[in-house]
């Protein structure tokens, strides 16, 4: 019997892609394939690609070309495969298979077919699959953190975004399925679950006829996981019911990732997000009133077609006014297949880059000021790494999401994968510094009156 080939994975892109990669690893391992972290030693490399913006495509193509030039057999999975299947098959003879964004559960069958000499194109025209708790999964995050996908796909048609074309219509998992997987992850020692989808506040709309995020959060409150974090919360979906569920569910962090994209009503209308322009300020103010300790992250696009200096200043003032904890800014990238690619009055590349840099410069003193407000506080920190040269522990407090926000550098003994209480001693623009709290610190904290 011929031995099965050894497989390595090259993961690119977002956390949704990461979950797809984790399921493919789990399925192949269950089927008896060897998984090697070293691409040089593997017989086949599965590259799970990203195609969200031009820079992501370029990174994906560079990775594919480097592997092809080294003589590797390649399976191209993910968004680039979904987007450019014909070109990839024509231009990369080393590609033995393509796997679409809704087809990763077929990876074992795909590999088996390639072993018999077939060149496989496993891409569904309309992605419709979503994994549940029964599909094997091998996590690639640190042991204490897991992403938990609640839905896949998107029914919105923002002018700049290719995601609905690449990932299909929204399809939500059942509450029972999500809670079951959360319990599995808790049993593995996970301390933090990060809820993800394209629009998490729309969770359940397709399945139940109405958004059900509030009910899902309350159900997850019964799972033995200390931290539950919400990503991709659209502002108009933050209803009083959702805000109440965040406030009243003990393990749901008051951390919200709000993909606002812009502030000016004219640009939001051009982005096909006209509903947002008149509610941004009001929703953020209501959030801060209802959740005084809320940590707010958002992302913006600089240089969208038609963006004038007036529009740009409006966005800059919006950032200054609301003092977000974390801000990411992308220069607009025109994407084939989106409405924005044909919009008039494109902004020159050098202006887009300059505006992006200016927005980040606007945010930096705000971020540093908000971080420095943590100095002297006792906070829980999830310890994830040990610095190889200094021995400092590296973790995150509740105000930092994995991969996209800052970290906390911690002096003192602390076990990896555990929450420890840390006194914050210093801060900079992106990170905090602290030391493991002493018994005296903890005693003094216990004597303080509750501020709740």
UniProtKB/Swiss-Prot annotation:
[4Fe-4S] cluster 2 binds at residues 154, 158, 161. Residues 372-438 form the TRAM domain. The keyword 4Fe-4S applies. It catalyses: L-aspartate(89)-[ribosomal protein uS12]-hydrogen + (sulfur carrier)-SH + AH2 + 2 S-adenosyl-L-methionine = 3-methylsulfanyl-L-aspartate(89)-[ribosomal protein uS12]-hydrogen + (sulfur carrier)-H + 5'-deoxyadenosine + L-methionine + A + S-adenosyl-L-homocysteine + 2 H(+). SUPFAM superfamilies: Radical SAM enzymes (SSF102114). Residues 140-369 form the Radical SAM core domain. Binds 2 [4Fe-4S] clusters. One cluster is coordinated with 3 cysteines and an exchangeable S-adenosyl-L-methionine. Residues 5-116 form the MTTase N-terminal domain. SMART domains: Elp3. Catalyzes the methylthiolation of an aspartic acid residue of ribosomal protein uS12. Belongs to the methylthiotransferase family. RimO subfamily. This is Ribosomal protein uS12 methylthiotransferase RimO. It comes from Synechococcus elongatus (strain ATCC 33912 / PCC 7942 / FACHB-805) (Anacystis nidulans R2).
């Amino acid at each position: 019997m011929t031995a099965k080939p050894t497989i390595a994975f090259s993961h690119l892109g977002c956390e949704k892609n990461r979950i797809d990669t984790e399921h493919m690893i789990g399925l192949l391992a269950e089927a008896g394939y060897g998984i090697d972290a070293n691409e040089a030693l593997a017989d086949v490399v599965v590259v799970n690609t990203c195609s969200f913006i031009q820079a992501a495509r370029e990174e994906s193509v560079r990775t594919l070309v480097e592997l092809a030039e080294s003589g590797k057999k390649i399976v191209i999975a993910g968004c680039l495969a979904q987007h450019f299947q014909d070109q990839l098959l024509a231009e990369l003879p080393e590609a033995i298979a393509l796997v679409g964004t809704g087809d990763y559960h077929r990876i074992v069958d795909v590999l088996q077919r390639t072993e018999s000499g077939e060149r496989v194109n496993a891409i569904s025209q309309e992605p419709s699959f979503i994994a549940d708790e029964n599909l094997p999964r091998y996590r690639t995050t640190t042991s204490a953190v897991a992403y938990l996908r609640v839905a896949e796909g998107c029914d919105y048609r923002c002018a700049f975004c290719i995601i609905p074309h690449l990932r299909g219509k929204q399809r939500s998992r059942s509450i029972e399925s999500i809670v079951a997987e959360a319990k599995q992850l808790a049993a593995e020692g996970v301390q933090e679950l990060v809820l993800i989808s394209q629009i998490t506040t729309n969770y359940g709309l397709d399945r139940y006829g109405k958004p059900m995020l509030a009910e899902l959060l309350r159900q997850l409150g019964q799972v033995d996981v200390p931290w539950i974090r919400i990503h991709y919360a659209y502002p108009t979906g933050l209803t009083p019911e959702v805000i109440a569920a965040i406030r009243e569910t003990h393990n749901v962090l008051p951390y919200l990732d709000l993909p606002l994209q812009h502030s000016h009503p004219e640009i939001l209308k051009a982005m096909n997000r006209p509903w947002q322009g008149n509610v941004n300020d009001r929703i953020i103010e209501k959030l801060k009133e209802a959740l005084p300790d809320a940590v707010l992250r958002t992302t913006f696009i600089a240089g969208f077609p038609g963006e004038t200096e007036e529009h740009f200043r409006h966005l800059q003032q919006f950032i200054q006014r609301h003092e977000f904890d974390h801000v990411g800014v992308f220069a607009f990238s025109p994407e084939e297949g989106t409405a924005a690619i044909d919009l008039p009055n494109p902004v020159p590349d050098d202006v887009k880059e300059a505006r992006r840099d200016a927005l980040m410069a606007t945010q930096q003193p705000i971020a540093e000021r908000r971080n420095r407000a943590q100095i002297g506080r006792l906070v829980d920190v999830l310890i994830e790494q040990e610095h190889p040269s200094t021995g400092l522990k590296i973790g995150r407090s509740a105000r930092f999401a994995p991969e996209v926000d800052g970290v906390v550098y911690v002096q003192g003994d602390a076990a990896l994968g555990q929450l420890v209480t840390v006194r914050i001693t210093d801060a900079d623009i992106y990170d905090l510094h602290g030391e493991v709290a002493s018994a005296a610190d903890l005693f003094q904290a216990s004597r303080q009156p509750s501020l709740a």
